Amino acid sequence: MTNIRLINLFIAALFCALNASAASLPKKKYPGGKCYIWRYTLEDKRESSYTLDRPQRWLSHKSIERRHKQGLPLDSTDLPVSSGYLKAIEHMIADANRSTKRSQTESMIIGTSRWNNTVLVRSADTTFLRRLGEQAYVKRSEMVWEAPDSIERMIKIKANYNFNSWDSLKGVPYGHGREQIEMLNGHRLHNIGFRGKGITIAVLDGGFQNCNCIPTFQHANISGIKDFVYPNSPSFYQETDHGTKVLSTMAANEPEVLIGTAPDAHYWLLRCEDQETEQPVEEDYWAMAAEFADSLGADIVTSSLGYNEYDNRPGYYRQRDLDGHTALISRTASMLAQKGMVLVNSAGNSGMGPWKKITFPADADNSLTVGALNQQRVNAPFSGVGPTQDQRVKPDLMALGSPACLISGRGAVIRDMGTSFSTPIVAGLVACLWQALPGKNALEIIQLIREQSDAYDKPDNVYGFGVPNFWRAYMIGRLTNDK
């Protein structure tokens, strides 16, 4: 009891410190004035110039091959949003902009989702936005973002180019990351050469501070970056370091300091979390990032993001909505396995608050939701619990996250707490396992990992199926391949 109370007090003090720090940052008036983003769900995909027999027009060769290898056919959700409807919207926008005062922000399309058949439109003119929602080809419309009055001024953070002498653990190859990989028996996959080579992981996060200059990442296989947040950051690598920490648990390769769980994998860094506000449009950004990951041929999506409440929108979601399909973000997440990808998503850190449960999209079907354990393999009190509204086991897995060893945006070795970090630790080992068992499809990999977790026969709402054993998953998976 004493240890749990101490942990609770520590977490509460940490959250208070973070909130106090955020409150003290300098502010500036939101650039461009008051404007809004509305989401329009279209009726269908008629009047389109795209056809399912020519997917190479919008999907990469790697994406098409991934589906072909897993026997997954294309369907109507894969088709881009109707080019005919987009042209109609663009004509309406052009007419609206011609009558707009120069002091106002011009209207424009800022994104689409082919899986959800939606379009995002930004404008300062709410009359125009409502009129657009009345068009025959629009099924539903909703305001999903409102410009804040002010935002924080960006403060550039310099990175360290060398580790401190005490960061090195002589004679310990994995350095400070030893416990988090050994808890999952993943080091044994590394020992026989499976370190994620040939696997592409898309990291969906809010920022990757200094990943372009921290020496640790200079030798990582970072294939590319993309920003889905409106407006795009003027300095992609100076946003929050949350994604930097996440990436380090997988991609770091610093012997005796920190070796991540998939140092040989390839990574795409996709920014889809807006740090300035918490609004429903972030679900759209996440969906656009997930679809982009699909189109470039990613094998795994790791996401340490979760939502359950939004600014000035009390009651937007209820716990009964945790069914994997009500929230746009969860509905999108539930489609990843159908496209041949494995989603590894954090359970969320709401366990100590009034919500307590997992957050969206941790309720997604056919995904691996990860909670956090402490070093004694006891669940962290902040880790979100299940089950889903339709009584599926959640979280699926547990891993070290209270605390985990990471590299911060300053390039320093630190320990931090959250399901945000237990999640990529697992995602990296999913990459290693899939490298070792390339004949498996996404659903088979997901089920294999669940089945080789230590509570598979007696899952509950706190630990899910328990702690996965990736070495045993490999051994069992290899046996089934040989049959």
Which ranges hold each PLM region?
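Bacterial Sec-dependent N-terminal signal peptides
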Residues: M1-K29
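Catalytic-core environment of secreted peptidases
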Residues: I214-S223, A372-F421, D457
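Primarily auto-inhibitory N-terminal propeptides
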Residues: A22-R102, L120, T127-R130, A136-I151
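Subtilisin-like serine protease catalytic core
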Residues: G177, H187-K226, N232-E282, L296-D299, ...
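Autoinhibitory propeptides
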Residues: A88-I181, H187-H190
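Substrate-binding/access-modulating region of protease and related hydrolase catalytic domains
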Residues: N253-E256, L269-D363, G409-T423, N461-V462
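Hydrolase catalytic cores
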Residues: L247, L270-D274, K357, L397, ...
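Solvent-exposed loop/turn segments at secondary-structure junctions
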Residues: K45-E47, N116, F128, A147-D149, ...
